[in-house]
Amino acid sequence: MYKRQAAAVALLLLLVGVAWETAKLVGGDPWRYDSFLGSGIGFHHDPPLRIAQFSDRQLPHLWDIAGAMAAPVQRGQPQTLAEYLVGAALYTWRSAIIGFVVGALIGLTLASIFVHFRLLERAFVPYVIASQAIPIVALAPMIVVGFGRDITAVVIIATYLTFFPVTIAAMRGLSSPDPRAIELMRSYAANRWAVFWKVRLPASVPYLFTALKIAATASIVGAIIGEGPGGVRSGLGRAILDFNQYYITGPERLWAAILVSSLLGITFFGLVRLAEAYLLRGRQRVET
């Protein structure tokens, strides 16, 4: 199963790369290479169309992005752009994981309260939903002002984007057990705590993993957004802002940072998916 999934991901990435270069072939800027990738073979190509969105400034060639990854991040430094972005990705991942865990715990706690106290659910769930209507790019500077320009603000933003899907999915999962199972537990004088641990929580695990896969990528997005106004010293958000200032002269660097950010989100999603497959062996997955 895992080999098929890995092959599917590899095929998807290959198709994206083919579509990318096909767009350049048809509507990009003219190509001229005196020695392509150091092979000594040169060629020239003049695309039949001129589409601004496919120009080298808007959409660099994949091999130009790869070349930028292998080049020094700054002139005179031994560190390559790839090494710099890997370090930035690890920094972002640290903030995202903390926000992911805290957001998941908050979401599960809120869902548990709402399931057991319907009055609180009717009173507060609309506000939980309304909180997600606030644009995160507008909320992030306010969080930075309130909590300071450090990793704390980044973690809070990642938590903010994580708790909502977990809350909604956990509410559905905790409400999913067969009522007869709950009545059976109560017939044995089980209290709410026992029913929660032995019936409700186990039944909610498939729903939780569906939400956690969404929250994993959301936490990466939140961490990257938070690193912009957060004033942190590293991270992919900081790299994206820095490279955006030099986009006219070096668009490949910004695209490299974007691609690494995407790979980080895919990696985090994959890790949660592996945990789901391991813990839910033989159980049917659900979609929320």
Q: How should these model regions be labeled?
A:
Residues 1-2:
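Conserved small/polar residues in nucleotide/adenosyl-binding loops
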Residues 9, 95, 214, 222, ...:
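Pore-lining and gate-forming transmembrane alpha-helices of multi-pass membrane transport proteins
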Residues 28-101:
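Periplasmic/extracellular loop-to-transmembrane helix junction in inner-membrane transport proteins
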Residues 98-128:
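Transmembrane-helix boundary motif in ABC transporter permease subunits
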Residues 125-165, 172-173:
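Generic hydrophobic transmembrane alpha-helix motif, especially the helices
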Residues 156, 160, 193-226:
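Transmembrane alpha-helices
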Residues 166-208:
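Short cytoplasmic-facing helical segments at TM-TM junctions of multi-pass membrane proteins
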Residues 175, 255-288:
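C-terminal transmembrane helix and the adjacent membrane-cytosol boundary/short C-terminal tail
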